[in-house]
Amino acid sequence: MEIPIQVAVRICPYTEPSENRKPVAGAEADASAFGNAEAKAESFSDSEDNKNDASNRQRPEESTDANGNSEGGRQLKKETLPTDSNGNENGTIVPLGSGCCVQAIPISASALGLPSALPGGRAQDSIAAGLIQVGAHTVPVTHALGSGTTQSQLYYQTVFPLISLFLEGFDASVVTYGQRGQGKTYTLYGPGFECVYGEADQGVVQRCVRDIFAHIAGHSERTYAVNVGFVEICEGEVCDLLDMGNVHCQSVEEVFRWLQIGLATRQPKSAHSLFTLTLEQQWVSKEGLIQHRLSTASFSDLCATERWGEPPPGNPRDAGLQMLELVVNTLTDPSIMYGVNGNIPYGQTTLTTLLKDSFGGRAQTLVILCVSPQEQHVAETLGNLQFAFKVQCVRNYVIMNTYSDDNTPISPETMPNGSSNPGAGPLAQVAAGDNFGLQFAASQWFKLVSNAEGLFAKLMASNLISELEKEQIEEWLFLKQECEECLSSTEAMRSQKQLVPIQEAEEPEESVSEPPNSDNDTDNESQRPDLADKLESLMEEFRAKTDALIQSKHAEFLTKHPKAVMQSQERDKESKLDAPPEKDKEKIEERKTSIAGRRRSIQPGASLSTAELALLNRVALQQPTAQPPPSVLDPESSIDPLESSAGEGLRQAAIAAAAANAPIEQLQKKLRKLHAEIEGRQRQLKEIEQTMQVKQNIISELVKNSDTRSHAKQRFQKKKAKLEAECDKAKKHLAKALIQGREKGETERWSAIIAHIEHRLEDLSSMKHIAGESGQKLKKLQQSMAESRKQQEELEKKIRKESKLRDQLETELAKLKESRDGASGGKELVKLDSPEQQGRQLKAVQARITHLNHILREKSDNLEECAGGEGPAPAQQESLRHEIRNLRGTRDLLLDERCHLDRKLKRDKMLTQREERKLLECDEAIEAIDAAIEFKNELICGHKSIDTSDRLQREKGEQMLMARLNKLSPEEMRTLLYKYFNKVIDLRDSSRKLELQLVQLERERDAWEWKERVLSNAVRQARLEGERNAVLLQRQHEMKLTLMLRHLAEETSASSASYGERALAPGHQTSSGDFDYELDFYKAAATTTTTTNHKALVKPPKSTPSGAALEKYKDKEQRGAGRNIFAKFQVLTRYASSAASAAAAGSCSSTVDESTALIESTTTATATTTTTTTTTTTGGKGKERGLPNIRQDQLKRLMPAPTVTKVTRQKNKIIIQDASRRN
């Protein structure tokens, strides 16, 4: 809902100055408003500059607010003025000659038929719009209020509609704007809460509060929560006037009480104030739905505009008001909006940030402009009216803040029981099952705390706050983190409680009574660390059951399926297997050739040994028994052993062996990687366990020694308080010496003493901080323990997973090795153990016999065709057989040469480049001879030639190529064949070299991967070892630091003598009352003169103390520091400072220097001193002056406390050495 901002202009009442009234100095003679409020405001502002002027003082019962507005101003009694037909008061429009130039021209709504703004009000009360006329200028506004408008009329006409929307769940905002002394604060808050004023003068805020609580009382079925807040913005800083944040209120009286406290706390200087009231409501609608609404009403009292500069209207002096005008200009001017790309500068100032919802936001806004009718304020009035006119063009996107819980019907258990008391507290009547309001409030508080955390972080980074404030902020941040942990644990419990099973309507109640427990058990198990193992085991079980179910269903389907369909499926399969398409054939052949040629030149199984070659020759030359004569010999039967002897079968066997070895090698490689990973992770796990044990020891020691640290901190605090008191005394004496104009040496001495005490105070603060940071260390160690525990769980999970994978790979590797060994020993007879294996073997033999019968039948048919004369002539067949024998002889020679090269390769492990090429030529020539023998055998069998059988199916280009080849002469054909033969050899040679390079690169990659794995494990191991060593050092440091702090506490308590007790001796004559403080402790010049039964301390004559005495005392203390325990404490503090600044390495050195200075100065503070007694003589240059005698108790008080730390220091030294030796 897009609604423009409403503007109401209220003219301040004007009264002619009385002639007999004494004019107020500094104020304008004609400035008077609600009960001389303006004159009073001017006098208040002038009184800041002229405080001694008696004429600036006003009556004590009249006061102004922080903005100079009249809070106690009351309207003067004004005669009843006649009204015109429109209900306008003619008497309020003062002519220009009388000093007023602003007129309000309200437009009555009675003629328009609009309802009255007041319930049952008159016609003149129903003002809908109006004009403000300033001289010749006229400005239209939403509400034009004359000087005679009362507080009640203003409220019901302008503010009451906003409060109605506020009670429905919309945000509302009321902003007062104007120059100084025109009644802005009076409009909002009235004259105050004094009993002398009636309710008729109450402001807008009080009336809104009464209406809100009246509405609450009238709807007793609703639960509610009302919170108020009151802040002040002064020079960009936000100040909480209530010092409580948002305060919960249950009645009108409580709100008024807090409002009165806030008004009394406001600053007298110019500032903005913001009073907010938040209403949270919840009820059940007639449809049974839970309705939840949250609305906020803000009342902003802005400071005076005080425009200045050129052009004449000028700009407000306040930076917040200037930025507010810039925001309004941006919202109303499309060119400016386009220039900033839609980024409205709300965040430039604090005021615009807080008023973001009021101007261009989601609140219904009313701006009340208070103007002056006087001529001298015309420029500022026009400027403010121009701003108000622009504000009316701003549109807010008003929405209802409702939360209906996704239209969830409320259950009978969560219905409110009976009528609830409105004053019972926030959401007190909500049933136990409905905690939505509390959850929403918690979320809102979480947002506020997050914003506060950001502000605190900025303050910490700005370095504009003291150390005490920093400690408070750090403590607040730790408390916030603890609250977040508590909330996270409660959220987890809540999420577990909300996971309930869905109850089916048709199931009985007994069946649904048990599942919640099982669900809760599973939810609880989800928090356990062994969840992954259980889940994996369940997945394996599920997978096995699924496979078994699929197999059973498949078997059942096969048994129940019709045989006709099964036969049709088998015929389809057979047709597909018998007649594959030619493209598939070509792909299969290409795949076979690629597999056969892949790495054949470098695999040892591809070569033929001498024994194998002899065996193959015997098989080739031997004629098998029970076969037909050579004339009718089956050519294919004669080529089968040749094909096997040609190396195809052995090649296939070599390829199969290589294929069998490849997965074994891959598995072995994976196993090596897994072994390395498991060993590395086990070492890391061991390091983490040791580190966790050391951390746990540190935590237990910190908890055990917390009392010692707190005791030391208290001692340091007491010592710091004593030193602060001594510093204050020294400063007083220094000021006294400066006022009395004493000698320069004494002032320098006091200045040196003060500087020394302040230095000691800084050292004590640092020591107190070191003693008090055990809580932070404990929290950090606990967080580190949690992180280490998480790392331990992750490592254990990875180790279990990798161990399981290793077992699987080992099982698979064992199976592969068994299968390979069984294949290599295939010549041996294997006894079948089970009848199933015998049945499978029998089926395989029967299938082989069937296949051989089919081959024999085909070959007999071929023989019959040859005998019938379909094949070539007998002479031609004999010629072809002769050529085949010649080719076999050539092939045998090539095989002998190849075997010779193989033996040389096995013996020497390398060949020359020419021999490698010769080996490839032999392989290729053997393959070519095999192809030629196969071609001639096909000719003998009467098959068509390969070149002519598929000529009709060739493309046109191939046909032309074959025609050209057929026309070539034998010489040309041999030349072409030799050329392509060399090209094939070159290609195979390059392929072999590439394969060798690939193998080498793969080996290098494996080596680099192994190195990388080893190095990464070493780095992780080193990191964990370093962490463990650091924790060990920290433990040693904490032990030593605890002993040092215990000893320091004892020394601090023992050294009870302070600067006040060690009197400081001045350099000139002082009174006897200051004698105890003026004894010079830093200077061993105190003398004792023994008179008749009296001991007196006499100052040296004409002695002028200087900084040398202080330096002498410091040197003496530093010499004694060698025997003090602070020498060891310095080393410990250096470690603490470096550990504390681990995030910023650059600050380590400065921290060490500060710790060193801390130890040296603390040594000075705890060293015991002795007073040196000297005898004064009468031969001095100056005149001796006797001092009054001192009693014995005073002398005892001046004596330093005896040292009690010598024995304790030796004990602690022995303890530290023993602890270091054990660690």
From Swiss-Prot:
Biased segments, Low complexity type: 1162-1178
The UniProt record lists the keyword ATP-binding: yes
GO molecular function ontology, one term from the record: microtubule motor activity
Main location class: cytoplasm
Residue span of region Disordered: 13-90, 494-528, 560-604, 625-646, 774-799, 1162-1188
Binding, ATP: G178, Q179, R180, G181, Q182, G183, K184, T185
Function: Regulates cubitus interruptus (ci) processing by recruiting multiple kinases to promote its efficient phosphorylation. Scaffolds multiple kinases and ci into proximity to promote its hyperphosphorylation, which then targets it for SCFSlimb/proteasome-mediated processing to generate its repressor form. Hh signaling inhibits ci phosphorylation by interfering with the cos-ci-kinases complex formation.
Protein's UniProt name: Kinesin-like protein costa
